[in-house]
Design a protein with these regions (language model features):
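Aromatic-residue hotspot detector
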Residues: 30, 85-88, 161, 294, ...
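Outer-membrane beta-barrel pore domains
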Residues: 49-69, 111-115, 245-456
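Surface-exposed coil loops of outer-membrane beta-barrel proteins
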Residues: 52-58, 105-124, 135-239, 250-258, ...
Length: 456
């Protein structure tokens, strides 16, 4: 969540900086533009606790097999971006993303089709920005990072939105944001689980989006069509050491709801207490969602989620935290658009959606260490333990993102990341998560992710 806030502020800073050193001609704007890139080699090994199917079948339960099984996948990728220098406050930017999985077998294609498998390239960003004073407008295809509208970058292809975003910092210590989006680009063409695994390709922009928090409600996926979405947000830092954030998201005419609309709410406070040898961190968040007609109401996603977290940082290289979240009875919570919205209790790999269902209580303990303090610059480790209890609904009818029996899930997660000082731009990371889900039966699952990224 803090990254989301920082990214919004970074957009403003970048816009103001570009106008300060603007080009004099269109030719200069392109000549003085900046090229950025990243080369990637990733290896994922995932075991969902289900056997590999004989045939890849689209859709959800009981027949659908996409996203199930036990397989590994090696992928290579490239990101290439370009942004012009500012000319009278205007600049243009574009970002291509490419992915290739040369050794994927049929089991890997079935398992990773919704999120990782698909070869080719996509123009994920193509935008114009305009800065006037302390106001920046950005229109076109773009990556967005905010609490309720968030492009997940945890897979090879980062999600993107076709949108218009307006950011203003005229008020002291305050950032105001407004935005509109009408299309979304997922991780693969099969992010909605609509085709067999071997047919998954690169994604395109569509009038549908991931509605994180709905589980597998629409044909086995959390993807729904919509007719435009609007958002407004504010960040205030007027009180020393305290950051307050609020955001509202309105989604018009959501698919399968007979024209129903979604209203999603977010409020957060982050307080830092500087001490002599460390910092004490106190965080609290509210998430909520409301629906607009009888059809949408029958899905029971008018829930409230309350979260709290207390932690320490910069204690001789150590950081640690304890977090708790709870969701209201028989009503789940929509977390937002895209797979990027998160919660304090989200497991490292599994993500936040398992914490936002109706009747859910979750706890997470996290400990990290920065080896820079002992002379190993760039090396960091992280460990997490997460426990999630979700009870079955006490009402009849559909409750999205619910369970059919009382469920207890535990996650042990770890990460090692190394920014190699001798090879600037090269980062290696290894993540692993072991999970156990217990209801009427016990399912054990695990996932390993290795990433090598070189930025230039």
């Amino acid at each position: 969540m803090k990254l989301a806030k920082l990214s919004l502020v970074a957009m403003v800073v970048a816009g103001l900086a570009s106008s300060s050193f603007a080009a004099d001609t269109l030719a200069d704007a392109f000549k003085n533009g900046k090229v950025t890139g990243e080369l990637r080699a990733w290896y994922f090994d995932r075991d969902t606790g289900n056997a590999n199917p004989a045939t890849s079948i689209p859709g959800g339960a009981p027949a659908g097999t996409l996203g199930k099984g036990n397989a590994d996948l090696f992928s290579t990728g490239v990101i290439l971006g370009y942004i012009t220098d500012s000319l009278y406050g205007l600049s243009f930017g574009a970002t291509f993303q490419g992915n290739y999985a040369p050794f994927a077998d049929k089991d890997a294609k079935n398992l990773y089709a919704p999120d990782m498998y698909g070869s080719g390239a996509v123009l994920s960003e193509a935008y114009v920005t305009y800065t006037l004073g302390k106001t920046t407008a950005k229109v076109g295809r773009q990556f967005i990072a905010s609490p309720l509208v968030n492009s997940s970058g945890s897979r090879m292809i980062k999600e993107a939105f076709q949108a218009a975003v307006l950011i203003n910092t005229d008020l002291p210590n305050t950032t105001l944001v407004a935005g509109y989006s009408d299309k979304f680009q997922g991780r693969t063409s099969d992010y909605d689980k609509s085709v067999a695994g071997g047919d998954s390709e690169m994604p395109s922009f569509k009038k549908e989006a991931v509605f994180y928090g709905t589980g597998s409600a629409n044909g086995g996926s959390n993807v729904f069509g919509f007719d435009g979405a609007y958002t407004a947000a504010a960040i205030n830092k007027s009180i020393p050491n305290l950051t307050l954030t609020g955001q509202y998201l309105f989604v018009n005419a959501v698919e399968l709801t007979n024209g129903g609309d979604a209203n999603v709410f977010y409020a957060e406070g982050n307080y830092v207490v500087p001490l002599s040898n460390m910092k004490l961190l106190i965080d609290a968040t509210y998430r909520g969602s409301r629906t607009s007609n009888a059809t949408f109401d029958s899905f029971h996603v008018e829930g409230d989620m309350y979260q709290g977290r207390i932690g320490i940082s910069e204690l001789a290289g150590f950081n640690a935290s304890f977090a708790y979240s709870t969701v209201s009875s028989d009503q789940s919570v929509l977390l937002g658009a895209g797979n990027g919205p998160t919660t304090y209790t989200a497991p490292l790999i599994k993500g936040a959606e398992v914490t936002s269902g109706a009747n859910t209580d979750a706890y997470k303990v996290e400990v990290g260490y920065d080896f820079t303090k002992v002379g190993v610059t760039g090396l960091k480790v992280l460990g997490q333990y997460t426990k999630i209890n979700q009870d079955k609904p006490t009402i009849t009818g559909t409750v999205l993102n619910s369970v059919s029996a009382d469920t207890e899930s535990t996650y042990w997660s770890g990460q090692i990341a190394y920014d190699i000082p001798s090879l600037k731009g090269l980062t290696l990371s290894l993540e692993y998560e072991d999970a156990k889900k217990e209801d009427t039966a016990t399912v054990n699952s695990n996932e390993l992710r290795f990433r090598a990224n070189y930025k230039f």
